[in-house]
């Protein structure tokens, strides 16, 4: 499964992307502290939804047909080939929007305890 915060810095400004992730994690930790939570884990449903979105975005690119480093190519015993992205390709603004939606939604998609 693709990670909830996949590293997309291979296709954007590393500093900007790193700052976005650091801000988001910091905000989540502050939210957890205010709510007296000490544990956060993405739900299986959220992981599947995010993975599907990452793969769907990637499938719409020409990169999906390559055998480059950003693609995990698996050759199945039945002769089929499966290509999965190793990075997020949806773009910085969309990534920020998705992160903000999760935060503003009270970290919906995460189990907090």
What kind of feature is each model-predicted range?
Residues 2-113:
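C-terminal, flexible cofactor-proximal segment of oxidoreductases
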